[in-house]
Amino acid sequence: MERGQVSKLGQFLPLDNYKPISAADIPDASLDMATIYIGFHHCPLPQLPAFIDSIHRTLRPGGTLIVRDHDVRSPEMATFVSLVHTVFNLGLGATWEVDAGDFKGFRPIKEWADMLTAHGFTPVGKALFQPNDPSDNALIRLIKN
């Protein structure tokens, strides 16, 4: 592939602090695939169910949801990935106050898969892990029931 051959596809929609995606922005059953990369753990817990349901609403039956998130199965890993986030935020110029207010609801990837299953998705295959990634980012695929 030569440089410059890939053009921009689609339209950018701001995350809007994990508010449910409106049908005006993305109509029902209009997407074949959605991706959430290192994002679910930042969603405030009271907003998580409605946000997940809105993703489900946008996908066609059999549509794919790709999720990448930390597989946090111990307090030590939670501390480590929190530190990784703090360093990342500070590298972007975020203040300590902004970083301290950044919600980080880390959990095992199996819990994410179970939660998504409860909202109408089915996991497909096994979680993939990048070799030598100390923050245990897992990549999972789910399909809309």
Predicted features by range, described:
Residues M1-A23:
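Class I SAM-dependent methyltransferase SAM/SAH-binding core
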Residues K8, S30, P61, G120-P123:
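Short loop/turn motifs at secondary-structure junctions
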Residues S22-A34:
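A short acidic, Gly/Pro-enriched loop at the edge of an enzyme's catalytic core
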Residues L31-Q47:
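A short SAM/SAH-binding and catalytic strip from SAM-dependent methyltransferases
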Residues P49-P61:
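A short glycine-rich, Lys/Arg-flanked "PGG" loop and its adjoining helix->strand segment in the class I
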Residues R68-P131:
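C-terminal alpha-helical "lid/dimerization" subdomain adjacent to the S-adenosyl-L-methionine
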Residues A138-N145:
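C-terminal lobe and adjacent flexible extensions of AdoMet/dcAdoMet transferase-like proteins
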